[in-house]
Design a protein with these regions (language model features):
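Accessory nucleic-acid engagement/destabilization modules that flank
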Residues: 1-2, 11, 23-326
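Walker A/P-loop
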Residues: 343-345
């Protein structure tokens, strides 16, 4: 039965109207309100990392990458998959401002699949392959046109490594990361505008025939953007990013703190989810189960089976969905993670 409060012996201020009283007290933040309220940029970090994760490996849909997974292509990459991912995303953005492309992405009923590979929008770099082969640097016009798209594109193209100025074209045995030998002032004043394909991967042979680049830009099958599961997640993130643009857009591209942590979340999520393989019965481990997609022909990675042979592991669609979810979880945990870091104070 229930008791009725008649009188209080002691300090009545310690009791509520029903006679309940706390039996203990703590200075710890049990409700963890500080986690949610102290990080004003946490929402932007989470949403940007999540959208970049949905985009980061789209370039793995290329014929060249799928052939490499099957062991049919062993030469050094001419174009890395993250650069193809960037170009695919920018083809979707087109000439729109941030609000326009986010509104298109927020409509999960419209796949907009054609615009991702429309020849008029999908610019395919073929560096050093002859006159007229150069394509405009991706960030040159994007910085003013759609700064949020530029920030997302930066996360996509840097999820493995940061751009590096390529060695001089006259150098022999050119490799990515070799010393440039000179420095240009605009790299400090406008660091993104000059970034081109060879900042991501150097073409060792400047005489590479144009046809050799084609498998890197031609898709081996439908992009994951055509799948409802992908569009649903992308639309959800796009709607949140649209809200962050209210009442006026914020310059996230120049917020180094946000970009650095969003990139950290994306890279950690990518490494984590890529490490998830099969259980002892040859089935996807439990952590993968919510994201496994059936009837997929494009894959993101491989795994050794029990006989020591390489087999397809995560489908490309599964990988994008899983990494996006992991990036969201990691970014959500950042405020709590901070408390466990060593500090001077």
């Amino acid at each position: 039965g229930h008791s009725e409060l008649l009188w209080v012996v002691g300090d009545a201020r310690q009791f509520n109207a029903e006679g309940a009283v706390p039996t203990n007290a703590t200075a710890r933040d049990i409700l963890r309100a500080d986690d949610e309220n102290g990080w004003h940029s946490a929402e932007a970090i989470r949403r940007m990392a999540r959208l970049a994760a949905l985009l980061h490996d789209l370039g793995k849909a290329s014929q060249a990458f799928q052939q490499r997974l099957k062991g049919e292509r062993n030469e050094r990459n001419l174009i890395r998959h993250e650069w193809v991912s960037l170009r695919l995303f920018l083809a979707f953005v087109g000439e729109d401002g941030d609000r326009q492309w986010l509104e298109r992405l927020s409509d999960e009923t419209d796949a907009n699949e054609a615009c991702w590979t429309d020849p008029a929008r999908y610019l395919c770099d073929k560096p050093g392959s002859g006159p007229g082969s150069a394509t405009p640097p991706p960030f040159a016009s994007l910085l003013q046109q759609a700064p949020l798209a530029a920030a997302i594109g930066w996360l996509v193209v840097t999820h493995h490594r940061l751009p590096a100025a390529p060695p001089a074209s006259s150098a022999t045995n050119r490799r990515w990361g070799d010393k440039r030998g000179c420095f240009e002032k605009n790299w400090l004043t406008d660091p993104l505008t000059a970034i081109a394909c060879e900042w991501n991967e150097v073409i060792s042979n400047p005489q590479t025939p144009p046809k050799d680049f084609d498998p890197y830009w031609r898709m081996a099958g439908p992009l994951p953007v055509a799948a409802h599961a992908w569009r649903k997640q992308a639309a959800r993130v796009a709607r949140h990013l649209l809200k962050l643009q209210q009442p006026q857009p914020f310059d996230w591209l120049n917020n180094i703190w946000v970009l650095h942590l969003a990139r950290l979340c994306l890279m950690l999520a990518d490494h984590h989810y890529s490490s998830l393989g099969m259980d002892g019965e040859g089935r996807p481990v439990a952590a993968r189960q919510p994201f496994v997609q059936s009837q997929q022909k494009l894959f993101a990675n491989t795994v050794f089976d029990r006989t020591g042979r390489r087999q397809p592991c995560q489908s490309l669609l599964e990988h994008l969905l899983g990494v996006s979810d992991s990036a969201a979880q990691i970014s959500h945990a950042l405020p709590g993670f901070e408390r466990h870091l060593p500090r001077l104070a």
